[in-house]
Amino acid sequence: WSDKKVWGFDSFSGFPSYDENDDLEKFKNLYDNKVISKEHFQDYQLNIQLKEFISGKSASPSTISSSMDFSETSLSLLEDKINYFELDNIILVDGDYKETMAENMYTDVKFMSVLMDCDLYESHKIALPFVWDRIVNEGYMYLDEYYSLKFPGARIAADEFFENKIDKPRMYPRKPMDFERWFVKKNSE
């Protein structure tokens, strides 16, 4: 076993409020501004069509995820699973990102690898600087929603954050028809 810790930050109460950058129409802006590829935009459009056909409802930020808004996420259920598997290196931080990821929180903690999976614009705006300041040099940040078909705000927030940084999101090499996977390796700070 490793002596490394696995940290998990979550509100365990569902999504926070939606920002205008989470509006699904932002995908059109991303495409028009050549931020996302034609293939990405077409995949998004197909995803929307399928979701609306299956649900019979118009897609929106609050209905686009198959997990809905994650309001049914259970801290106690997750803790039970952690205990069942006797995983003693996991630290769960329960609460609103504005409080749990404040600049003065966990200042002595360092991350070597981070899975950034917080879906919405505002969550990314809070989490990105908090996590980036704690990633060790040569550490990795995996951007789960950078190639999202549901959450445009994640891409917008990441691009805003990395705009003035030397390190930029990069796509893993892929074969045709593979899903895009994006990461940032911290080399500069």
Regions flagged by a language model, labelled:
Residues 1-189:
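S-adenosylmethionine/decaboxylated-SAM
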